[in-house]
Amino acid sequence: MFTRADFEIFDDPTLKGRLNKIYTELDPKFEVFGAQLQNELAVATNREFTLHIAKHLRRFKNPPMNTWMALSESSRGYKMMPHFEVGFGDDRIFVWFALMAEMPDKTDYAPLLASQSEKLLSDFTDYDLSYDHMTKQKFPMSPDNLQLIQDKFAKTKKGEWLLGKVYLKDNPLFDHPEELMADIQTTLLKMVPLYELINAK
């Protein structure tokens, strides 16, 4: 499904051209893969998830540097609650379990996340962390990096809490699309117990 050729979409320098390629080439893939993930998440959690695909409606000049789909339990949106994201940048696919700055009660989640530090360090040794979904900066899982993300999320207005994986386009998995898709799905589903814990607060 996802292939290295998909990154060529971001070679188009125009807003109209890039958006058209996103809408006609990537979004159909998001629809298919998103439906698969919806089913897997429903089985794993006994909850109903809605698929949201970025539409870039506020873009009037600069072409988007990335595009994504999100899965949340609300049909009205996803940024104000814990959710999953799978998306493309110009050089990567990203898979995140995300708690974003828009969450109205995000500081309520910080103590619970902090209490899970030991388990996070043991269960997600090969995962990445970030505190800002708008940048490419990511941090490998480590005690210091986890503390950094926790502090940014708890103590700064724009701080976010992102756990997941980044697949750079030179990753050998892109030579085997079926293995890539399976790995992305496994990466996301491994975070389901954390999602359920967070949502049980």
UniProtKB/Swiss-Prot annotation:
It comes from the Bacteria. Belongs to the UPF0637 family. This is UPF0637 protein LCA_0842.
